[in-house]
């Protein structure tokens, strides 16, 4: 038996013994009466007190005798004082043997790390300068049956951090910070758009036709209606129906689902912002996106320079704007324009680069395959990649000067796609033809090709104003702003294989 396995078994036996002891303590609490009281109401948060009274001296606090009621989880217990933690931070609470009843002092000795307590008393400052609560009353509110990870081993196993996020949040301030930032980012995006007259809406999660993106859907069955339904891969077609209906500026922040691979950049369930504005084009969205990203960086980091790993992304500088075609040539000087304009040569380049070439792809799709294999990972600083071929952009408007490409961009930062946007196709007949082409692609073996959506075509036949739309991956954006290496670090409960 390996030493590692033996150590793991020893730790498990030790944990089981600790759990058994804590259950005995809970049984003793039950015998006293209500072991889980719910009649305490706090009036202060730990970190708020730290901030509010940071400049008060020991003498000033003693003279003021400021009463407070706090509650939190015991993170440190030294007998005469404890450190408790709430959602804002930590504060010390002092066990004063002169003022607390003997019964309470005896109970305090039985409390463990992880227990949740209430504390009432007055604020004071120690000789070392630490703010604390000198308790006049303290109670156990919730007994923790499982021990917290000890300070030496901690919760260092990454997979366990994802599986037991509740423990991760208890013991890792970095994790708590990440999800506070995530909430802050989403709140600011919402504020940013509402201030610009966008209307927040909700569209169906369950759809009869999965549309709005090239992706594999999750399929389910509606029992009452006896029909197949799909978890949405994107809200796009419903949001554009709303633009047709007269809601000219709309947005939605919600979940999308794609039945595809899991990686440091992909989770089957993820959060997207999608927004649409009439009487605008993809260039307007580029400007809006730059403005939003600069505001978010300034809000979260206090700077438009965004550190990520060993790199720094500069959001304060104009984002590079480059076409798919030109970016391939720029980052692969051994290739020529003639190489990319010949379908047979492009097919060979794509195959050599590692793309999954089926053999029926047109020139535009082959160019995108080459771009994905040879260029994407090289786009470190923010890049708007524009002029995607129309055959891979079935919902985007063709470019007026070159109908082989569309008025579309994707934003890349750190070699990752962060956003996708375009001037929307509002020609109903052209849209119908492109849907038919997508159906042919699907019949030829492309699982990610789109279905034909007759109702969406009908909506366009009523007339949609010139419109620009965009989708931004919230998870990847938060990864950048929190310097997180994996998408699982910014999703509270990422998908994992069941434990054996």
Curated annotation (Swiss-Prot):
The keyword Cell cycle does not apply. It comes from the Bacteria. Its main location: cytoplasm. Its EC number is 6.1.1.6. It catalyses: tRNA(Lys) + L-lysine + ATP = L-lysyl-tRNA(Lys) + AMP + diphosphate. Belongs to the class-II aminoacyl-tRNA synthetase family. This is Lysine--tRNA ligase. It comes from Pseudomonas putida (strain ATCC 700007 / DSM 6899 / JCM 31910 / BCRC 17059 / LMG 24140 / F1). The gene is lysS.
